[in-house]
């Protein structure tokens, strides 16, 4: 049984209306996982998000972002989300960012944050979410403890990042 089949089972399970049946099916499903052979390679972004969701429901809404302060909102289809995530990953790769690199994300919660997170998953990067409220001292400690290979930040944070 491949990973795509497992994800399809989970999606079917989540759509069940009968909670008692859902509980029984979930229990059997998780028992089966205990004996499953772990695949040597698996990339959720490529195999499941793109290989399953983009392929089968590309034009359907995958993501809705809303700003509670301004009431601005944006929605993205599976295809759009994948496009923006891949665009971000391609730019990172052109900049020399490679699989296994530590990528700090010091950005506000905007759609691009989600695209960058997707790019990290697909590209095998280690995503390091970083609070936008961090001080120079806190960043210095983090950078010494866990050095960044790449850093994605809103330009308003560049001064504190450069100082660290």
Predicted regions and their residues:
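Structural core segment of the AMP-binding/adenylate-forming
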Residues: 1-14, 118, 122-164
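A short N-terminal helical cap/helix-turn-helix that marks the beginning
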Residues: 2-21, 39-64, 83
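Mixed-charge, low-complexity intrinsically disordered regions
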Residues: 18-19, 27-32
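Acyl-group handling in specialized metabolite and lipid biosynthesis
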Residues: 32-41, 68-74
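Short aromatic/basic micro-patch
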Residues: 43, 75, 152
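Short, well-ordered amphipathic alpha-helices
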Residues: 47-49, 89-90, 158, 162
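Conserved AMP-binding/adenylate-forming core of the ANL superfamily
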Residues: 59-118, 135-140, 144
